[in-house]
Structures are given as structure tokens and as C-alpha cells.
């Protein structure tokens, strides 16, 4: 979103005044900037021309401060808050606890680190449970209420949870609410988003042929990705409210010029036409600047876009080479250097009589920054040689609990390392590439596959099903 006003709390009071973006009622969110002092949530205000609201809060739980006055939309927003006040207050308290634990985790190690991770999981489970209670309360109230913008906003939120949460328990209720809508509400951006969540398109994956569609420039001319067949394409899904998206634009410009003979950069806005036109006034793009005018429900849904910036590298023959999410200075150059070249093949061999596998195949990985270049098995150790790719001058870290797990369940701890120290920040060089070696206790002689595990937490890096035999 865009910051429209700032005030400081003085003597228990704050005041905002400004011009609305249109004659329609729109959502504005009040947030606090004091990290750790107030929960990382927002208070929703629905504001149109000549709207006057009074906000009252008697604690730090911003999301449940009471709002008086305003339109039908604001009154329904307050009804939603009142219906779940107990759960929302508990949720905000829990997020404060999570923030404190997250701060403590940065300097923790060993058993203390594991204890904090366990507590973080417990608070996350509490928050998930509370969120589901809130959703159930929302659904009950929505079934009894007239549809308005806040109603649709709530339905859209339920649709997003359905999209992201594989165990979402209210799919049937969301479908029932959606099916009850008149066509005029189904055809809104929120209505289309909920439809996409209920009936998602097939998402194209790395290695598959790229999805295409009608893509419009600012003059209304239609383009297609297939127009660039024979060249690499770097797709950039973005919006003006995404800080890293804007931060990436100078590097995208540099890349578009550096690789102009072999690669086309295509920035695809996921905003409305109005928002897109406004965004390029402040952030003009000198390369392909397109939009399918379907928000997250068109080509973005085909590529599984959730967070942004979301990048997709497409090969000259039209297949997807690699997709990734997020940005840091220099990362795009690192990624193109890595993926715009022939990929190394798996080779089985020996080194001084020990079995080796160069660039071993694996089943799944959440550790895109790590590429295992060789596995060597000796009588005294299993050796992993790793090449890392990451944001230049940023750090990566492997936990002291990093280990291997053989296909028979044998756990092999780290014996020693070369090139980095476990449990400590390793800052990447300016190239964004680095090599290091990990020595683990030997895997069983009969092993066919094993897993690399940085730890047991949900956020730990894992590479599963690493194959060491043909």
C-alpha cells in the first residue's frame, strides 16, 4: 500500500486528515511503526468523502480499537471485530510473544535455540487456531448480513486462506457464500479472486512449458510471451505497494540492457489498470511493461504467484528454467549467471577409490541457495561439497544441528566444516557465490538415498532424496 498520513501519539491522541483517492468508500489501514511495542497488525478504516471517524483504544491491541461513525461499511467492519474481540485480542498478544521469541532466536544456539523454536511453533499453532475461530465467526455473521465492500473483503480473505492453507476447514462455507452472490459482486476483483481460490487453474512448474495469454501495454496493444520465442524471458510480477519490487527495478533495467540480444525482461503488474497507470508515473519502466488486467487471477495464477516480486526465467524454447520469489541487490544477476547456461549433469565416479556423485539428483528442496556439487563417501566420513548462490554481501547460516538422514533412518551428524562455521553468519562475497565443504559421519554402505537437513524446524533448509547410486 501507499503511505498517506503519519502522526505521533501525544497525550493519548492522534489525528489524520486528508483527501480520499476517489468518491468511493475505500479501505485505509492504521499501523504502528514501533516494532515490538505494538502487535504487527492493522486497524481497518473504511473512508469515503466527508467521512469522520473516532478511534478509541485503551490498550496496545490496535486491531480491536473501537471505531465510531462512518458508513455502512465501517459499521459492518466493527461488527466483525466485535464478534471476535476475545480471539483477536488473544491473537495480538500471541504475535507480540512471537516477535520477542524471534528476537531472542537471533542470538541463541544449541538447546536454547531448539527451545525457542519449539515455543515459536507453539505460538504459531495458537495463532492458527485463533484465526480459524475468527473465520468461523466471520462466516456466521456474513450469512446473516447484506453484501457490501467489507463483506466482499472478508470473503476475499477467506479465499486467500483457502488458497494457501491445505488444511483450510471452511471450503464448503466459502463456496456457499460465493454462490449466493449476485453476478455484479462475482465480477468484482474480490469475486474473481475467490473464484480462482475455489477453482484454481493448473499451475505451471519448473521444467514445463510456460503459460501465455493476452498481455496489454499502456496503449492497449496486445502482446504474448510467444512473441519472444528464441530468446530468454525474465518475468517480473510486481506492484507499486511492494518495496522489494521497486528496489529491483534499477537492476532489471541494467539486465535488460546487458542481455538485450539474448533476453527480454517482461514486468507484469498485478494491479488494476488505474493502479498500474498510477504506479508507472512514479516508477517508469523502459522495458516491456504489461498487464493482463486480471490481478492475481489470470496469468499470475497460472504461475502460482503468491508473494511478490515473483520471477520466472523462461528458456528460448519456451520451457520454464527457474522460478523464485524475493529480491536483494545483485540477486538477479546471480540467478541469471546460474540459470542462463547449460546445467551440470549427474556423474557417478570415484575419487582415490571412494565412490562419488557429482551434482547428485534429488527429489525436493527448499534450499535453492545451495547446490551440492559432489558427494564423496569414505570409511570415515560422508563429504558434501556445496556451491552457494545468494544476495551479494548478505549472509547465510547453517545451524549447528545440520545432519544427514539415510534412507534406513540412520542420522549422521556434522563432524567438521571447511569454508564456513556452523551457527554463525557467513557473508557472501560480491560475486554472490561461494564454496564450502561439510564432513558428516559416514552413511551406511547400503544407502541409496539420503536427506540433508539443517534442523527439524519448519524453516530449516532441507534437500530430500539425494541419490548416491545409479
Residue ranges and their predicted role:
Residues 246-283, 294-301:
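Structural microenvironment flanking redox-active thiols in thiol-disulfide oxidoreductases
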Residues 381-390:
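Short, well-ordered beta-strand segments enriched in hydrophobic/aromatic residues
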Residues 280-317:
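Short, internal strand/loop/helix patches
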Residues 413-457:
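Short, solvent-exposed, Trp/other aromatic-anchored flexible loops in extracytoplasmic proteins
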Residues 229-230, 237-254:
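Conserved redox-active cysteine motifs that mediate thiol-disulfide chemistry
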Residues 192-225, 285-288, 341-344:
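N-terminal "domain-start" segment that seeds a small globular fold
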Residues 316-344:
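Thiol-/selenol-based redox modules, centered on thioredoxin-like
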Residues 1-126:
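A non-transmembrane, solvent-exposed segment enriched in polar/low-complexity residues
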Amino acid at each position: 500500500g501507499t503511505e498517506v498520513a503519519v502522526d505521533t501519539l501525544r497525550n493519548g491522541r492522534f489525528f489524520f486528515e486528508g483527501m480520499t483517492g476517489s468518491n468511493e468508500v475505500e479501505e485505509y489501514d492504521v499501523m504502528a511503526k514501533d516494532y515490538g511495542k505494538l502487535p504487527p497488525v492493522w486497524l481497518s478504516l473504511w473512508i469515503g468523502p466527508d467521512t469522520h471517524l473516532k478511534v478509541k483504544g485503551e490498550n496496545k491491541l490496535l486491531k480491536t480499537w473501537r471505531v465510531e461513525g462512518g458508513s455502512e461499511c465501517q459499521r459492518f467492519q466493527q461488527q466483525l471485530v466485535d464478534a471476535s474481540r476475545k480471539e483477536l485480542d488473544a491473537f495480538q498478544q500471541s504475535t507480540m510473544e512471537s516477535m520477542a521469541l524471534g528476537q531472542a532466536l537471533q542470538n541463541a544456539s544449541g538447546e536454547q535455540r531448539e527451545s525457542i523454536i519449539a515455543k515459536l511453533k507453539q505460538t504459531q499453532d495458537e495463532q492458527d487456531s485463533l484465526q480459524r475461530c475468527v473465520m468461523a465467526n466471520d462466516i456466521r455473521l456474513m450469512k446473516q448480513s447484506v453484501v457490501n465492500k467489507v463483506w466482499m473483503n472478508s470473503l476475499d480473505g477467506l479465499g486467500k486462506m483457502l488458497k494457501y492453507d491445505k488444511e483450510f476447514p471452511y471450503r464448503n462455507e466459502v463456496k456457499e457464500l460465493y454462490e449466493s452472490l449476485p453476478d455484479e459482486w462475482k465480477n468484482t476483483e474480490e469475486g474473481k479472486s475467490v473464484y480462482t481460490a475455489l477453482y484454481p487453474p493448473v499451475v505451471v512448474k519448473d521444467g514445463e512449458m510456460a503459460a501465455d495469454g493476452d498481455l496489454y501495454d499502456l496503449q492497449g496493444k496486445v502482446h504474448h510471451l510467444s512473441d519472444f520465442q528464441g530468446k530468454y524471458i525474465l518475468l517480473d510480477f510486481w506492484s507499486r505497494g511492494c518495496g522489494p519490487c521497486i528496489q529491483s527495478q534499477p537492476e532489471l533495467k541494467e539486465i535488460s540492457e546487458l542481455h538485450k540480444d539474448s533476453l527480454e525482461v517482461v514486468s507484469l503488474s498485478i494491479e488494476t489498470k488505474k493502479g498500474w497507470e498510477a504506479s508507472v508515473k512514479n516508477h517508469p519502466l523502459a522495458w516491456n511493461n504489461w498487464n493482463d488486467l486480471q490481478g492475481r487471477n489470470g496469468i499470475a495464477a497460472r504461475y502460482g504467484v503468491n508473494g511478490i516480486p515473483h520471477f520466472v526465467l523462461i528458456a528460448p524454447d519456451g520451457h520454464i528454467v527457474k522460478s523464485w520469489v524475493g529480491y536483494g541487490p545483485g540477486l538477479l544477476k546471480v540467478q541469471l549467471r546460474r540459470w542462463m547456461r547449460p546445467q551440470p549433469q549427474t556423474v557417478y565416479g570415484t575419487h582415490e577409490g571412494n565412490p562419488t556423485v557429482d551434482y547428485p539428483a534429488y527429489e525436493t528442496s527448499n534450499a535453492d541457495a545451495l547446490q551440492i556439487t559432489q558427494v564423496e563417501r569414505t570409511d570415515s566420513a560422508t563429504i558434501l561439497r556445496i556451491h552457494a548462490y545468494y544476495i551479494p554481501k548478505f549472509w547465510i547460516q547453517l545451524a549447528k544441528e545440520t545432519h544427514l538422514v539415510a534412507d534406513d533412518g540412520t542420522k549422521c551428524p556434522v563432524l567438521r566444516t571447511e569454508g564456513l562455521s556452523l551457527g554463525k553468519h557467513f557473508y557472501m562475497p560480491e560475486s554472490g557465490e561461494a564454496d564450502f565443504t561439510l564432513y558428516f559421519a559416514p552413511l551406511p554402505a547400503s544407502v541409496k538415498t539420503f536427506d540433508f537437513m539443517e534442523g527439524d524446524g519448519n524453516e530449516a533448509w532441507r534437500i530430500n532424496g539425494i541419490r548416491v547410486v545409479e
